[in-house]
Design a protein with these regions (language model features):
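Extended substrate/RNA-proximal surfaces in nucleic-acid metabolism proteins
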Residues: 93-242, 267-270, 274
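Short, intrinsically disordered, low-complexity segments enriched in Ser/Thr and Pro
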Residues: 62, 66-67, 73, 152, ...
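Active-site-adjacent structural elements in enzyme catalytic domains
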Residues: 25-32, 38-41, 47-77, 82-126, ...
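Short, contiguous clusters of charged residues that form electrostatic/catalytic patches at enzyme active sites
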Residues: 59-66, 217, 379-382
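C-terminal functional module detector
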Residues: 1-52, 78-91, 95, 196-213, ...
Length: 679
């Protein structure tokens, strides 16, 4: 790695963009942002940027600022690189870039606000206890003045162990020989970041004299450390139902039971990103436990097919083609081997010769909006909102607002403004052709989209106003489109009470109003101010010659759906308390949106703690990865063949953005209502 260079930042444009025509309401405006963006200071993003993985090269923090300001025309964003990979030098450069990005705006005419932040990245290892899986969480800081010396990570997990391995440098150099400069730069980065010890390994004197990485192995340790440092910070779970890192039977409720939740910091939930949708709860099981504690494979249902069962079917079909006697034995043996390795990321490789399309739709919930890959239902937003746990002398539950963001790993904040350039605007990746023997094509690459946004109701584009609204949950998520959404409780004395609020009622039936207006349709290319602010090479490299460029015409809202959840301690029967949808309203949108009012006449009778939120869904438009597996159906509507959206190998078509029609949508934050004096 001595021939390579450590990461450097780029140049932030000193130009501002013209003021946005913000969406005015009587008191507040709606601002759109992205609170989950990775630069190539993140170890995984740097790795995926390499030529061996068809990467497009380095994207440092300055790129995130320039992209947010000119390409996606956001109002706010945050760089959230993985703390576990950041050195102090990289953290300092990120903060400097964040401050420089803000400095372009004058206080009187702010065009973009950048928040400091990082990702705390935790997961249990193979065979680990699912109750000790807490997942990935972004830490977003209010201030740019009171900052930690280094970000707080969760310790090495997953990809870190592969990259830290002693054989990695040799394997990389040999696999893609001769190496390019960026390959050597990555090895220098790897050697530097993984040579820095954890602060827990040093004494106080050593910590003062040398660099170390701060670690908090649990959310509780993270919350406590944020308190010790007096940091005004929000901690936002994300990608929770994504099976890439979450064990099959992991559950958000375990964090309530184990004192791993802080209701003052963990007030938001990233329900949608470029890594999929984590909204819905479905009673599905990837495996079951027998009475003697062993793993077993459940039978498929009309709604869900476990991959262990599909593994058995593939093995049986291979056996029958070879004419090898009793194929049921082969099926049962393969099913059992799969569930025995249910936490092993190599489990899909147990059947020699099986291709991604052979697995059909296994592991995926059906008839839902872009669910995360190998879905974990008890880690979903609905499961979290429905769960209540008695822990010690307290009753714990989640009261979480819903946001979206991109989780883009190429510094492209707010990348979903147009549906194009699947790999650049999303995170789909795969090895180049001569290396697919080492990293074979896999079906998970089909499940990446261009990502979502967080929308904030705030008085003006001001750091404190935005952060206050984030704290108050007066926010909502979108799938990337700038849909306008209002959702209020109408109280006879208090008037309108906005999304994210908590209230107790005893004599008043809860009545609500909801209004949604579709996003602007887009023109091709970039606005004139982009061409006067960025040189053409930067517009091509960063924006790919396409920017947020709205017309005056809006997409139409197709319908509005209401979800009602009664909070419960019966965690084994969450499907009984989640009504999705509870109500649905068809819109007659003529370009101005639609609005409805409704009342829950059962609330005063049932006297439950109840959660309400709404989804506003646009008429169908084409989207990247809109139909990840592209099923071919038979006459009965059964999926008999898939055409995965490959990212590598002989079936990868770089011109195919895998476009399919979807109903782009917005999810409101919930309104939390309890019957007065209920617990």
């Amino acid at each position: 790695g001595s021939l390579g260079s450590l990461p450097e930042d780029g140049q932030i444009s000193l130009e501002k963009r013209p003021p946005n025509n913000s969406e005015n309401v009587i008191e507040k405006q709606i601002f759109f942002g992205d609170l989950h963006v990775h630069t190539t200071f993140s170890q995984d993003a740097f790795f995926f940027s390499l030529p061996m993985l068809q990467g497009e090269g380095a994207h440092p923090p300055a790129d995130a600022c320039n992209f947010a300001r000119f390409c996606s025309s956001l109002d706010f964003f945050s760089i959230t690189d993985h703390a576990e990979g950041l050195t102090k030098d990289m953290w300092d450069k990120t903060i400097q870039a964040t401050k420089s990005c803000n400095a372009v705006s004058s206080n009187a005419d702010t065009d973009l606000i950048a928040f400091a932040g990082w990702e705390w990245t935790q997961m249990v290892g193979e065979g680990g206890n699912p109750d000790e899986h807490y997942g990935h969480k972004n830490v977003i800081l209010r201030d740019l003045d009171n900052l930690p010396k280094v970000p707080i990570g969760a310790g090495l997990t997953g990809l870190d162990y592969i990259l830290k391995s002693r054989i990695t440098p040799s394997l990389m150099l040999l696999a893609d020989f001769p190496p390019e400069k960026i390959d050597l730069d990555f090895l220098a980065y790897r050697n530097e970041t993984y040579s820095i010890p954890s602060c827990s390994q040093l004494n106080e004197k050593e910590i003062l004299q040398s660099e170390c990485k701060e670690e908090a192995s649990t959310p509780r340790e993270l919350f406590d450390r944020l308190d010790e440092l007096n940091l005004d910070a929000l901690v936002i779970p994300h990608g929770t139902s994504w099976g890439i890192h979450a064990p099959a039977n992991s559950s958000m409720s375990s964090q309530l039971d184990m004192n791993q939740h802080d209701p003052d910091r963990q007030r938001l939930f990233e329900v949608y990103s470029g890594h999929g949708n984590s909204e819905v709860y479905k009673d599905i099981k990837h495996f079951i436990k027998t009475d003697d504690g062993k793993n077993a494979c459940p039978e498929p249902t009309s709604e869900f097919e476990p991959c262990c069962w599909r593994a058995g079917e593939i093995a049986r079909q291979q056996c029958e083609l070879k004419g090898e006697g009793s194929c049921e034995d082969s099926k049962e043996k393969t099913e059992q081997e799969f569930v025995n390795r249910i936490t092993d990321i190599t489990r899909f490789g147990i059947i020699q010769g099986a291709m991604p399309e052979d697995w059909l739709q296994c592991g995926q919930i059906q008839d839902e909006f872009l669910p995360a890959y190998t879905y974990r239902p008890k880690m979903s937003a609905q499961a979290a909102l429905a769960s209540k746990v008695i822990s010690g002398n307290s009753v714990n539950r989640f009261k979480l607002g819903l946001i979206g963001s991109t989780d883009n790993h190429k510094a492209r904040a707010g990348s979903g403004y147009k549906e194009f350039a699947r790999k650049a605007m999303g995170d789909s990746w795969g090895a180049k052709d001569n290396l697919t023997w080492l990293i074979p094509p896999e079906r998970g690459a089909s499940f990446y989209s261009t990502g979502g946004l967080v929308a904030v109701h705030a008085k003006s584009l001001d750091r404190n106003y935005l952060f206050d609204s984030l704290y108050n949950r007066e926010v909502y998520a979108t799938s990337g489109e700038r849909i306008l959404l209002w959702f209020d409780l109408i109280h006879p004395l208090l008037g309108k009470i906005p999304m994210g609020s908590e209230i107790s009622l005893k004599q008043t039936e809860p009545s609500f109003s909801v209004k949604a207006i579709g996003s602007f349709k887009q023109k091709p290319g970039c606005p004139d101010y982009v061409h006067t602010s960025l040189d053409k090479n930067k517009i091509s490299r960063l924006c790919l010659n396409e920017c947020y460029n709205p017309t005056n015409e809006r997409n139409k809202i197709d319908r509005i759906e209401v979800v009602k959840i009664n909070v419960t301690m019966d965690l084994d029967n969450l499907d009984r308390v989640i009504q999705d949808p509870w109500k649905a309203f068809k819109c007659q949108d003529k370009g101005e949106g639609c609005s409805f009012q409704f009342t829950d006449s059962d609330f005063l009778i049932d006297k439950n703690e109840t959660v309400y939120y709404v989804r506003a869904i646009q008429e169908a438009t084409l989207a990247v990865g809109g139909d990840p597996l592209r099923c071919v159906l038979d006459e009965e509507g059964e999926c008999v063949k898939t055409v995965p959206c490959y990212a590598s190998g002989s079936k990868f078509d770089p011109k195919d953005d895998c476009l399919a029609p979807i109903g782009e949508r917005a999810w409101s934050s919930p309104i939390f209502i309890s019957y007065e004096n209920s617990t």
